[in-house]
């Protein structure tokens, strides 16, 4: 459940910016749109050194492990999005990534680990398949004696 917090001093952010960001990042992160949370704080007083040019600072928090490969992919996608939407150069966008353990995130009245299955669907299918084959082998051996 990624959470993307955006702070910017850009004066005019078009309506629906946060929705478009959620849709864009759902595709990039390969997650359902309903799992992407976006918070937008516009017209923040911001500076980089003595410069007060338009900037954006993002905090991206996720319950999945964030690897350098993923954060590079996300950074490219976010910088392209902010360039198109807010006309910000990539050096005007700072992104802080945080990976939290699922038990540190609460949603829908529970922590995320409570909503996860004990084993994955693929693993369960594999186990059921192996048990089915073992049962058939046993049954064939049993039928030899009848």
From Swiss-Prot:
Gene Ontology process terms (BP): regulation of lipid storage; regulation of peptide transport
Transmembrane segments: none
GO molecular function annotation: cytokine activity; phenylpyruvate tautomerase activity
Top-level taxonomic group: Eukaryota
Cellular component GO terms held in the UniProt record: extracellular space; nucleus
Pfam families, per the entry: MIF
Stored PANTHER family: D-DOPACHROME DECARBOXYLASE, MIF-LIKE PROTEIN MIF-3
Homology family: Belongs to the MIF family.
Stated name of the protein: MIF-like protein mif-3
Gene from which this protein is expressed: mif-3
């Amino acid at each position: 459940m990624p959470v993307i917090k955006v702070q910017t001093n850009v004066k005019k952010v078009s309506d629906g910016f946060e929705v478009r960001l959620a849709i864009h990042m759902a595709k990039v992160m390969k997650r359902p749109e309903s799992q992407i949370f976006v918070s937008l704080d516009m017209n923040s007083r911001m500076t980089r050194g003595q410069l007060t040019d338009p900037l954006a600072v993002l905090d991206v928090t996720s319950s999945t492990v964030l690897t350098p490969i993923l954060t590079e992919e996300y950074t490219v996608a976010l910088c392209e999005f902010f360039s198109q939407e807010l006309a910000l150069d990539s050096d005007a966008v700072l992104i802080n990534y945080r990976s939290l353990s699922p038990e540190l995130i609460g949603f829908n009245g529970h922590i995320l680990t409570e909503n996860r299955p004990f084993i994955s669907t693929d693993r369960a299918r594999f186990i059921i398949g192996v048990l089915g084959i073992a049962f058939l082998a046993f049954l064939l051996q049993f039928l030899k004696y009848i």
